[in-house]
A protein has these predicted regions:
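Bacterial signal peptide processing site
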Residues: 7-10
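Early exported N-terminus immediately downstream of N-terminal targeting peptides
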Residues: 18-74
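Short, compositionally biased low-complexity segments enriched in polar/charged residues
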Residues: 49-99, 113-114, 141-143
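Extracytoplasmic/secreted envelope proteins and their assembly/folding machinery
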Residues: 20, 24-27, 101, 111, ...
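A short, solvent-exposed beta-edge/loop patch
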Residues: 93-94, 103-105, 136-174
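Sec-exported extracytoplasmic/periplasmic mature domains
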Residues: 31-35, 109, 119, 123, ...
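C-terminal motif of bacterial Sec signal peptides marking the signal peptidase cleavage site
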Residues: 2-5
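Short Gly/Thr-rich strand-loop-strand
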Residues: 111-149
């Protein structure tokens, strides 16, 4: 069953009845060319291993990449396997740059857990930059974590966060 449509409709159907959204592509299209060049977007593949596109992801072998995401990126975001049905995210591993964007489709009953995890990530970024790099602290302070009308939890912690957030929200609603 695939539902495809144009125009506005009530969101009375469950998220699972809708066609699967390409969260990686939505993040890619919502952010700057520079971010696409330098920051990989990772997600979980059909086989349960993590995969990534863009940024420096091509420099990794598949297993290496999956391990890096599992051991470094996912703990940063605080997301555990049982908290989501689908996601795509991108975070900077550099300590001198605040950067994190994510779209997470929470597992049933886990929306608040996802919001709390992503809020904790943002607070951690704010705390680490508060007395370190003022420009990065400003970026972290403008970060947003919100549940959008389509049910996904979106985190935007980057330059021009309002624009990136609106781009993601618009693409998810399409």
């Amino acid at each position: 069953l695939a539902l495809v449509g144009c125009g506005a409709s009530g969101s009375s159907g469950s998220a699972s009845s809708a066609a699967k959204k390409d969260y990686t592509q939505i993040l890619h299209d919502a952010r700057s060319d520079e971010d696409n060049e330098y920051e990989m977007i990772f997600t979980k593949g059909e086989d349960g291993k993590f995969t990534a596109q863009y940024g420096y992801s091509a420099e990794y072998e598949a297993d290496q990449l999956s391990d890096e995401v599992a051991n470094m990126m996912m703990p940063l975001l605080g997301l555990e396997d049982d908290m989501y049905d689908d996601f795509a995210a991108s975070v900077s591993g550099m300590m001198v740059r605040v950067y994190g964007v994510a779209i997470v489709k929470p597992a049933e009953g886990k929306t608040q857990d996802v919001v709390d995890a992503l809020d904790a990530y943002v607070q951690s970024q704010q705390k680490s930059m508060e007395h370190y790099l003022e420009d990065q602290y400003q970026i972290a302070s403008a970060a947003r974590v919100a549940t959008v009308p389509t049910g996904e939890v979106v985190m935007v912690c980057c330059e021009d966060s309002d624009t990136v957030f609106e781009n993601i929200k618009k693409a998810l609603a399409a």
